[in-house]
Amino acid sequence: EESDSEGNNFIYKRRQNGSGAHIGGITAELKLGIPDIFDVQLGYTFQKSQYVEPEQWSDDIEAQRTMFRAPDHYGYLNSNFYITKQLRASLFGTYTGRMLVQHAAHTDIMGVEHPDTEVVTPSFWDFGVKFGYTFRLSDTLRLELNAGVKNIFDSYQRDIDMGAGRDSAYIYGPALPRTYFVGIKLSM
């Protein structure tokens, strides 16, 4: 914390690049299908992300090599099932494994002060489903009506900070709650 000549106080938070990192892992992907019946694509990644030297981001927390916001496990699924020539069902989603995140000192909505901490997040399954029906308007023009649900399991961060003293960078997990949608697609 510093003060200027007029007595105004300023708090500076400074970050600098670390000593380097070692990141390694393996990814497996699979794609299969039968034309006009179904297609499925899925992938899984296992990785390890560590700093070369232990990093310390807070005087209250012991230095460590584990990288923040870098899950060791994650995966995805994209699939389509062609029920009829016009009707298609899609299942899609992602898996994000547990990860270590920083939770900076903050004051909650009750006025209670909390010190810097590190949190291991839960894992998240973020799946959705979509149904689409295509109308053939002419030899070259198609109209698709679709509807679905994103984040079916309503996976989200349960410990979100609130209030003026919150740690606004303490965000993890799926960006949207369970969301229903409808759409129209015109293609040639």
Residue ranges: model-predicted function:
Residues E1-R15, I61-A63, G111-H114, R166-I171:
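Surface-exposed loop/turn segments flanking beta-strands in extracellular/periplasmic regions
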Residues E6-A105, Y156:
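Gram-negative outer-membrane beta-barrel transporters
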Residues R65-M188:
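Conserved C-terminal beta-signal and adjacent last beta-strands/turns
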